[in-house]
Amino acid sequence: MTINYQFGDVDAHGAMIRAQAASLEAEHQAIVRDVLAAGDFWGGAGSVACQEFITQLGRNFQVIYEQANAHGQKVQAAGNNMAQTDSAVGSSWA
């Protein structure tokens, strides 16, 4: 009896998480453009309030990016570890 695991699916899922993390930069920049376009709400695009909001937004996106990227790396590592263990166990039964 053969059991087939799809370790490639686990790796692909980890890669997808990491790609989504990387795409956050484009979303971040789009939000910053919108904030600057609505600068009057903040008292002008160059105002302290506007710049502080953009700074805080950048920090928040950085935390999200780092956590998502790290999670994707962990998922990929787990898939790789499972594949190696499965291969080692499988070859020991041969």
UniProtKB/Swiss-Prot annotation:
The gene from which this protein is expressed is esxN
Q: Name one Pfam family in it.
A: WXG100
Q: What is this protein called?
A: ESAT-6-like protein EsxN
- Looking at the keywords, is Nucleus present? no
Listed SUPFAM superfamilies: EsxAB dimer-like
| Phylogenetic lineage | Bacteria, Bacillati, Actinomycetota, Actinomycetes, Mycobacteriales
- Family of the protein in this entry: Belongs to the WXG100 family. ESAT-6 subfamily.
> Keywords of this protein's UniProt record, alphabetized?
Secreted
Spell out the GO cellular component terms annotated for this protein, sorted alphabetically and separated by semicolons: extracellular region; plasma membrane
Location of the protein in the cell: Secreted
What is the protein's major site of localization?
secreted
